[in-house]
């Protein structure tokens, strides 16, 4: 195998649709990766897939990971691949590239661990942090607002709570205001709920359980931060949030809290189409599957459009399979091209090829 000239092997490799299994067969073929015509495309695909092993392999063979203005780092931040972000940063990629794009896209997509990593490795809270807060707010990411706000060195109320007001439509959640509160009585129980400290809730329950406004606020906070144990405790103690309001189950769907969605549904909260749209908008596959099984006559085109626009490939695959309508593939492909979502573009391209091959086969038979 080693006796064939490079030129012959390169021609063979370029003819293969996926040459990588062969390339890793020995050191000789691995050394040819640098000569691949499509190495840039392959590298970006591996980053989009979260394949750290191949990112390391191609880098070890001389690939410039900062190619196209640190595009690989931007992609990793977008899709939440923390280990790839760490690797690229450790090997020279610039996390401040393009006016803090990495922090902005991670905040937009709700990747809290990447936001934390970026701040821990050079970002500082400043006036420049307001756009980050606004981006997180516009996309309903409570936990990022909380984290970034508490970085403010001028905040004298480090032990206070951040209260948020939000709005919800039939597929989106956004935060319209966020501010500190420092009422000692309320702040203690609000903060305890925010951080999931159920023991304080239990000890102080009799003090506030008769105050409907406070109880409702605590219930909302428990849902926002995913504290199912507090939600269960409040139900057990007789607290009842109005069933006609779907606000809380909408928040749970938007945050991806499947256990809370199930529990609220069990307690009488309705499952409606808008919940599916919200779960799809924020990329929560397990919640999407749970809701879909409990709905009838779902408007699949609507939710597929939402998930394409927001670049959640696995959910797109799930719904396209359920829809099973080849006539819509080109429409969806155009939408994916419009938003520049390469993973979804490749998926619909492959579906078109399969459809054309099936038609050709039927004609021949």
Swiss-Prot record:
Keywords: ANK repeat, Repeat
Annotated InterPro entries: Ankyrin_rpt, Ankyrin_rpt-contain_sf
Pfam families documented for this protein: Ank_2 (PF12796), Ank_4 (PF13637)
Residue spans of the ANK repeats: 38-67, 68-97, 99-127, 129-158, 184-213, 214-243, 245-273, 275-298, 299-328, 330-361
Presence of the UniProt keyword Zinc in the record: no
PANTHER family cross-referenced by the UniProt entry: ANKYRIN REPEAT AND PROTEIN KINASE DOMAIN-CONTAINING PROTEIN, ANKYRIN REPEAT-CONTAINING PROTEIN-RELATED
Name under which the protein is recorded: Putative ankyrin repeat protein R903
Naturally occurring in which organism (per UniProt): Acanthamoeba polyphaga mimivirus (APMV)
């Amino acid at each position: 195998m080693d006796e064939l000239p490079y030129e012959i092997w390169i021609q063979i490799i370029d003819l293969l649709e996926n040459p990588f299994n062969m390339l890793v067969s020995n050191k000789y073929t691995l050394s040819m990766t640098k000569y691949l015509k499509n190495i840039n495309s392959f590298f970006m695909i591996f980053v989009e897939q979260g394949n750290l092993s191949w990112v390391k392999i191609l880098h070890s063979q001389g690939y410039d990971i900062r190619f196209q203005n640190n595009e690989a780092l931007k992609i990793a931040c977008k899709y939440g691949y923390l280990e790839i972000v760490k690797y690229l940063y450790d090997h020279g990629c610039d996390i401040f590239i393009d006016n803090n794009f990495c922090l902005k896209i991670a905040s937009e997509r709700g990747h809290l661990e990447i936001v934390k990593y970026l701040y821990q490795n050079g970002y500082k809270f400043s006036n420049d942090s307001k756009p980050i807060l606004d981006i997180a707010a516009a996309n309903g990411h409570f936990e990022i607002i909380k984290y970034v706000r508490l970085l403010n060195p001028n905040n004298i109320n480090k032990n206070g709570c951040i209260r948020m007001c939000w709005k919800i439509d039939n597929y989106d959640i956004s935060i319209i205001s966020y501010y500190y509160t420092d009422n000692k009585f309320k702040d203690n129980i609000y903060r305890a709920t925010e951080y999931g400290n159920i023991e304080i809730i239990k000890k102080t329950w009799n003090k506030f359980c008769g105050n409907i406004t406070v109880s409702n606020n605590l219930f909302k906070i428990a849902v926002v931060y995913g504290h199912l144990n507090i939600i269960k405790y409040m139900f057990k103690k007789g607290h009842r949030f109005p069933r006609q309001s779907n606000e809380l189950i909408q928040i749970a769907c938007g945050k991806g809290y499947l256990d809370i969605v199930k529990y609220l549904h069990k307690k009488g909260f309705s499952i409606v189409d808008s919940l599916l749209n919200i779960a799809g908008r924020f990329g929560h596959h397990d919640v999407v599957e749970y809701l879909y099984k409990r709905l009838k006559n779902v408007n699949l085109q609507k939710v597929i459009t939402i998930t394409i626009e927001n670049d959640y490939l696995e959910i797109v695959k799930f719904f396209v399979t359920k829809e099973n309508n080849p006539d819509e593939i080109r429409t969806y492909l155009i939408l994916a091209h419009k938003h520049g979502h390469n993973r979804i573009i490749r998926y619909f391209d492959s579906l078109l090829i399969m459809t054309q091959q099936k038609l050709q086969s039927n004609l021949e038979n």
